[in-house]
């Protein structure tokens, strides 16, 4: 079977894009697919002998296996390629440093705020709980020197304050969790949509390069 190396790499990226990946990996794949769609001629140009582009050995070994197939069953070999293998291939692109790396960085930044917000919520929750504990301790101190009836009021106040803090922390944590899930979900939907259109690009590239 005759399959060009570039068509193989593009097909492998498309295959990985529809697999289960983390939010960060999804964002990076989205950036790569977007760059391929916008600069397909650059990628097709890699097929020339003077491009200087070399496929990493682990990816090349899978490509060599593909060449032994006589039908489309070779696509099952894509499962042998993981995200790291694709990353090692991408960083060898001539325009990785000048163009693609900044696009990937921007894509990763789009999913990082959710993680940052979650961390801030966790710190806020810890601070609130510490304040609640401190307040409860302070309220308990006067009860040892006061009459039993007077100690009940501070204790009740501390309990109410603790419940109020807990109540305020819960919605915040829930909101952040929902935001994180929505961010990952939206990123997944975007890359799936990109992968769908990218599939047509790969088919066209393969037709030109086979």
Swiss-Prot record:
It comes from the Eukaryota. Keywords: Cell wall, Glycoprotein, GPI-anchor, Hydrolase, Lipoprotein, Membrane, Secreted, Signal, Stress response. Residues 187-210 form a propeptide. A lipid is attached at residue 186 (GPI-anchor amidated asparagine). Present with 35600 molecules/cell in log phase SD medium. Seems to have esterase activity. Prefers ester of fatty acids from 4 to 16 carbon atoms. This is Temperature shock-inducible protein 1.
């Amino acid at each position: 079977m005759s399959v060009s190396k570039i068509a193989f790499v593009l097909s492998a990226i498309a295959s990985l894009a529809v697999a289960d990946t983390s939010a960060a990996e999804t964002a990076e794949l989205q950036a790569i697919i977007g760059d391929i769609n916008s600069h397909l001629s650059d990628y097709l140009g890699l097929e020339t002998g003077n491009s200087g582009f070399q496929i990493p050995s682990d990816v090349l070994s899978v490509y060599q296996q593909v060449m032994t197939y006589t039908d489309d069953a070779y696509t099952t070999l894509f499962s042998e390629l993981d995200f790291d293998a694709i990353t090692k291939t991408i960083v060898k692109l001539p325009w990785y440093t000048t163009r693609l790396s900044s696009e990937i960085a921007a894509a990763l930044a789009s999913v990082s705020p959710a993680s940052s917000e979650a961390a801030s919520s966790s710190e806020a929750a810890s601070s609130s709980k510490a304040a609640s504990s401190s307040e409860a301790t302070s309220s308990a101190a006067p009860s040892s020197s006061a009459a039993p009836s007077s100690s009940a009021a501070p204790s009740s106040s501390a309990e109410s304050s603790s419940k109020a803090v807990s109540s305020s922390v819960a919605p915040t944590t829930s909101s952040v969790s929902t935001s994180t899930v929505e961010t990952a979900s939206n990123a997944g939907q975007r890359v799936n949509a990109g992968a769908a259109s990218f599939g047509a690009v790969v088919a066209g590239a393969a037709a030109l390069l086979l």
